Amino acid sequence: DSADIDTDIICIDGQTIGRRADNTYIMLNKPRGYVTTLSDEKGRPCITELIKDVGKRVYPVGRLDMYSEGLLILTDDGDFANRLMHPSHEMTKTYHAWVNGKCSVAALDRLRSPFDIDGYKTKPAEVEIIYSCDDYTQLSISIHEGRNRQIRKMCEQTGLKLTKLKRV
């Protein structure tokens, strides 16, 4: 026998098991210039302006600063959001970072090493060159923590001028 979740009432130990709620999941390509918040007291553009027609209240899973762009997940599924954000799950986040000039081997080695950021020692990052020329280098940087402005602070501590940051 099988149950029809649309018509059958299912009970376990006297508790009715209902249908799972239909959750909403959005993959947003956040542009630069928007803050990752639902409202902003300073009047800056918010990501809610980009998702007006969703019809449900969703929340961002993590953050991207105003000057970063790229993948931002929004959902009304708190369990899913927690699985993605909680540090114990060590979810890998990959960014493309553009820095001025050619990136030296020493700078790459430094980026791959742990950093002290706001009193917290980060885990080593995975760093690869995507493209390099005299004017700029495009890097792929994968991290597991996602501390506040972590990639920006890593580049700053390495002496690199970050010009663009995109989560992929």
Model-identified regions with their sequence ranges:
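Basic, flexible Lys/Arg- and Gly-enriched helix-loop patches that mediate nucleic-acid binding at interfaces
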Residues: 1-168
